[in-house]
Amino acid sequence: MKSLADAVFPAEVFSLPLFHGISETGRTALVSSGWLRTCSFEKNQTIYHMGDRVSELGIVLSGSVFVENTDLWGNRSILSKITPGQVFAETYAFCREPMMVNVTAAEASTVLFFNLRNLDQTADGDDAWQSQLRSNMLRISMQKNLTLSNRIFCTTPKTIRERVLVYLSAPVSYTHLRAHETRSNL
């Protein structure tokens, strides 16, 4: 017999990194308490506007979305393309800060929204799954932080030549660091 969570959402939803290690009880609680909802968007439809205060992070289930900046003259810069399984707006939802970017559907897309306001409350004495959810969110945010750091390292040099050298040397530096770490642990 299918659980409530599996009956409402496809099994792939709960295999996403955000829900890794969440018990069946936790998944059922997420669904029954209304923490999750899905919404479909057409190409170029705005999901979040700059200045919005949001309480839900989004996870792309199908299609893709752009995180973009639009300047005063209407020039649009795409900062990131979010593909299926990836999370967006988690920092704004968690910190309750106004969005500094727009989020727009790059193509017909389906997004799972997860309401973070509920995460501040405990669930009927069984909050082990909430702790796991917080840990998963932290892991996702830290991975994004590392990606941003790498992007900053690559764009900080002044010339294109220096940027390319930094970009190409990163894997070599990482491999050298890992080899040194391994030798140190022997």
Question: How would you describe each model-predicted region?
Answer:
Residues M1-K43, F88, Y92-A93:
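Cyclic nucleotide-binding regulatory module and flanking cytosolic helices
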Residues V31, W35, M142, L146, ...:
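Amphipathic, well-packed alpha-helical segments that form the structural scaffold of globular domains
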Residues G34, L79-R139:
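Cyclic-nucleotide recognition modules
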Residues Q45-E107:
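Cyclic nucleotide-binding regulatory domains
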Residues T122-D127, L148, P171-Y174:
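Basic, amphipathic alpha-helical hairpins
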Residues L133, T156, I160-R163, Y167:
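N-terminal positioning helix adjacent to the helix-turn-helix/winged-helix DNA-binding module
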Residues R134-L146, N150:
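Long, low-complexity, charged/polar intrinsically disordered regions in eukaryotic proteins
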Residues I160, Y167-S184:
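Phosphate-/nucleic-acid-contacting segments
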